[in-house]
Amino acid sequence: GASCARALHAEGLAVTLVEPDSAYFACPFSNAVIAGLRDMEAQRFTLDGLRRAGIAVVPRRAVAVEPRRVVLADGAALAWDRLVLAPGIELRFDALPGYDEAAAEVMPHAWRAGPQTALLRRQLEAMADGGTVVMAVPANPYRCPPGPYERACLIAHYLKTRKPRSKLIVLDAKDQFSKQRLFEQAWARLYPGIIEHVPLSGGGRVTGADAATRTLTTEFGTHRADVANVIPPQRAGAIAAAAG
């Protein structure tokens, strides 16, 4: 949304950005934070640069879209000639039995950068050498298709360099994934014996979660984790549905 606002403003258009948060943590490079290669604060950005560029920033949440009007959470409305929706994602906590927002505080998704990113990093740091990390990767569609496999590489790097007796199991609800050949080559060359990828055809689809025991259930059995990273199914943010 911010990039679109900048590009349109550069063409001389009057642009208003509606955004409830005064700052945000960027997802790109957040996997490096999880692996201890980047500081969390480096991911934090404010909207001050947009304001300095002359873009009007309205610190509210948009809740409805009407013909030529956007309705805000406080009841105010903004008129528009052209409307761009940048809804982001909504995590579907109703899609995986046993995995809700409370469970995410034990088995973080870290698919929205910020506190969840820091939580997953702390859990990896606290895990004993020889522990097992289990990732659950959803079926398509979801934000950033290669992201889980990039994360697998970086977690494996952390384990290889800090906790070499540990392993990572990737439970995947797909048989094919983005940039698969490149990732598999990297796993074989850089992290042999560390990453075990379980595809859909091998029983990789996670069907349930138990936060109390950090256990993930698949159609073929269960996996007990010392650290569990559960990436749930997703959909477009609520404003997309509200807009019709």
Can you annotate each of these PLM segments?
Residues 53-71, 78, 157-244:
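A Rossmann-like FAD-binding core segment of flavoenzymes
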Residues 9-10, 126-129, 222-224:
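Flexible, charged surface loops at secondary-structure boundaries
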Residues 32-36, 102, 186-188:
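Short, hinge-like loop/turn segments at secondary-structure boundaries
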Residues 1-56, 139-181:
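Beta1-alpha1 glycine-rich phosphate/pyrophosphate-binding loop at the start
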Residues 87-162:
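Glycine-rich dinucleotide-binding loop and its adjacent helix/turn
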Residues 83, 87-115, 218-244:
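Glycine-rich beta-alpha-beta "Rossmann" dinucleotide-binding loop(s) and their flanking helix/strand
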